[in-house]
């Protein structure tokens, strides 16, 4: 029987040489995960990191002198991961990362958290991006694990922010922030450019600014997906938002003068984010005291916009429950506005820098969620 196009291609010597060279140039990828008292979520996180279509070449987990079962859980995977322990609790995520960085050997460094699950193709996606030698860092896509109304609102926020704002930032070649639980860097550049200054409470934003200051290329990959735990209590939510806003103001002060001189257009873009935040927060908090009717009209108009985006986000994220997010989300924007103004006064007006890290309560995670 004759089969059309049945010729079997033969590999020439030059072809074999090219394949060998390609294999020799294969980038090695390391994972760095700081963890402190993560007994409820750590095992699921480790399993997700191990179950990759393209395995990590090295997995480094830094136990920041935990007092729970974290060391015991890490010991269960001792033959598959590198588990190290700080001499004493640093009380700071970036300090634990800095300690763990000394053990990292890969060409590419991936950072995530002990309360985060990686999509099985996360490493595969990251590897594709770094095939471009000009790419220095990759920002991944963050999903909020479902738990209650707070995480539902956060899921809504993530979908809109990452499918609209971050896509636009990627188009303009100015990613605003690398997510701490879904980022990857060329290791040597991370060591020499990013560094750990420990002078802001949001090190991921500090790293991003430093890369921009040195004209390094950051890209956004929506297919490099992670699933993270967000605060499940209002108390935890407020602490996280206070940290994010405080860290934002700290990094604005730290890097703004340099950005103004070297990248004036980007300085304008950066300023607009904070100016818009101040204007919107002031509008929400002050208008009710000036004219209740105007405040009501503003909220009705805003509610219509939120409903439209919620419908789109529910479809985009394949999460129908997001249709229920607008009502509690409107409650949260007042809390956000208050915290934004509070941190502005503390960090910019009074200049009382906050560097205290608050660790939210964790809940158990399931691999079936991804």
Predicted ranges, named:
Residues 85, 92-96, 106, 120-194, ...:
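Long helical/loop segments within the catalytic core of UDP-sugar-dependent glycosyltransferases
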Residues 42-44, 68-76, 97, 121:
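Acidic helix N-cap motif at the loop->helix transition within catalytic regions
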Residues 47-56:
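Short, acidic, metal-binding catalytic loop of nucleotide-sugar glycosyltransferases
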Residues 57-65, 84-86:
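Short beta-strand/loop segment that forms part of the nucleotide-sugar
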Residues 27-30, 58, 206:
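Cell-envelope/extracellular polymer assembly enzymes that use nucleotide-activated donors
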Residues 1-48:
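N-proximal low-complexity "stem/linker" segments adjacent to membrane-targeting elements
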Residues 272-353:
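Membrane-embedded multi-pass helical conduit in multi-pass membrane proteins
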